[in-house]
Amino acid sequence: MNAPRGRGFNSQFYVPDALPLRHREFAHRGDFRLIGFPVAAPDTPPCPFQKRFPSQLVRDDAFYMSLAYNQAIDAWREDEVPIGAVIVSAGEVIGSAHNRVEGAQDPTAHAEMLAITQAASRLGGWRLEWATIYVTKEPCPMCSGALVMSRVKRVCYAVRDPKMGCLGGAANLNDLPRSNHHFELTQGGVLEDECRDLLQAFFRLKRMEPGENGGVDLG
């Protein structure tokens, strides 16, 4: 029997349809089904970058951006655009995610959106008034708007996006004079080179693939 192929599913195992009570039952059961779970997309080029392991003693911007960077590497390994986000409140990580647009086939499944949803669930409310989000690339229009609406206290991003960024790159939603919320904004300077190198390497490899012409203009 041929294993089903699908994006991100390169590990398949036969498992019983019903949980056996004893080893003997497991050995003699004939009704097995094939399942798969994502490990790495089958055609994804290996990620040449390593995760960061910052010291736990200093919980500064570089520490939390390192966690976001690690999320971005996880995205690469799933053949997603390598962008990661981490949300922190009172020194505690309350949201952590990376892009899942391709795997979920959901255009809203950006790292920031998923992290915001996690954080709101963790806090039991949608207002993230005391939270800081660290994200490896400047948020797009959708994510920038969501950050305004979530009342986040501060946004710190690593790489400016002059093409689609909406917090200083192509536009700045945080500067709208009639908006009912404005947050503190740190634009670049925190693991900026590392996050830019990761993104550029990903799209460089993608452009080498047949039929691929995507990318993000990072200046």
Q: What role is predicted for each listed range?
A:
Residues 11-14, 32-75, 139-219:
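Zinc-dependent deaminase
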Residues 89-90, 117:
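A cytosolic small-molecule/anion-sensing beta-strand core signal
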Residues 94-101:
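Short beta->alpha transition motifs characteristic of CBS
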Residues 3, 15-18, 24-29:
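Short hydrophobic alpha-helical segments enriched in small aliphatic residues
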Residues 83-88:
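Short beta-strand scaffold segments in enzyme catalytic cores
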Residues 125-138:
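Immediate flanking context of iron-sulfur cluster ligation sites
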Residues 103-113:
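A short, polar/charged loop-to-alpha-helix boundary motif
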